[in-house]
């Protein structure tokens, strides 16, 4: 896949898929249908504004901050010393237990081939056909866990390189 390295163009959608066919013209992977599934994260907020907010306050988009109620729940469950030690540990790391990502779904939506979840991108096929799905993570900061409910998937390539086929229920695709 390709993407821009200028300013915040990638975060504004300057990316796309590139599929390079084998030089021999003979693809060792046989499929009745072949789809590129390009996954990405998207915000309507200008990426430079997002970056500015994160530079001023790294947890700006993290609304699930630890509360006094949770602290007292920890005290009753684990004791005062353990509850305070837990808070100190997170403070020393300068993060909190809910800090999974810099930006949350509050600000992001997720796209499949440029379509929002409401658009419901669909790849057509007939029962019994072998369908090749070329998943690409074009997200700026999102890891995607991919599964097709009720179906197994066979991984045959990673980063464009053929691999020993392995059957899985789910794959995780990291940020490039």
Model-derived features with residue positions:
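Histidine-centered copper-binding motifs that mark active-site loops
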Residues: 1-175
């Amino acid at each position: 896949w390709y993407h821009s390295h200028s300013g915040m163009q990638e975060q504004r959608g300057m990316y796309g898929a590139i599929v390079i066919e084998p030089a021999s013209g003979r693809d060792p992977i046989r499929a009745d249908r072949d789809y590129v599934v390009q996954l990405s994260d998207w915000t309507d907020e200008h990426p430079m504004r997002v970056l500015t907010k994160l530079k001023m306050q790294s947890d700006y988009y993290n609304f699930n901050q630890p509360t006094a109620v949770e602290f007292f729940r920890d005290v009753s469950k684990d004791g005062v010393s353990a509850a305070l030690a837990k808070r100190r540990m997170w403070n020393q790391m300068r993060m909190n237990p809910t800090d999974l990502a810099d930006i949350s779904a509050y600000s992001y939506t997720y796209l499949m081939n440029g379509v929002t979840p409401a658009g419901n991108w669909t790849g057509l096929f007939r029962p019994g056909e072998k369908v090749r799905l070329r998943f690409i993570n074009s997200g700026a900061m999102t890891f995607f866990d991919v599964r097709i409910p009720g179906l197994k998937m066979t991984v045959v390539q990673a980063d464009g390189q053929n691999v020993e086929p392995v059957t899985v229920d789910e794959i995780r695709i990291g940020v490039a």
